[in-house]
């Protein structure tokens, strides 16, 4: 199972993460696909299920591109649960509020009796 809080879902497609990719991985954008979750899913390397919590008041929302992850998962290989949380930003309080949900979600996939 795989879950995330406010992930940068397609770093090769957003300005700030793409600049970091260029510095660390070089200018060849094709080589970046191995480090881009949306590209990996598009290339058939998905998880059966992914849980993502994203605050709708996140200052970085336009860079995180959750809609790209949602579109990539529609292809059928990955079942995405994308929960847009009203009023939450990109801070500790957001993560601490939903952490138990994520732990229970993973536990339910690992253990039959939870």
State what each model feature region is:
Residues 8, 57-58, 89:
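Catalytic metal-binding/acid-base residues of hydrolase active sites
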Residues 18-22, 99-101:
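Short, hinge-like loop/turn segments at secondary-structure boundaries
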Residues 62-114:
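C-terminal catalytic histidine-bearing segment of alpha/beta-hydrolase fold enzymes
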Residues 12-15, 22-75:
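The feature captures the conserved acid-bearing segment of alpha/beta-hydrolase catalytic domains
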Residues 3-13:
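Active-site nucleophile loop of the alpha/beta-hydrolase fold
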Residues 1-4, 49-53, 81-84:
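Structural recognition of the beta-strand scaffold that forms the well-ordered cores
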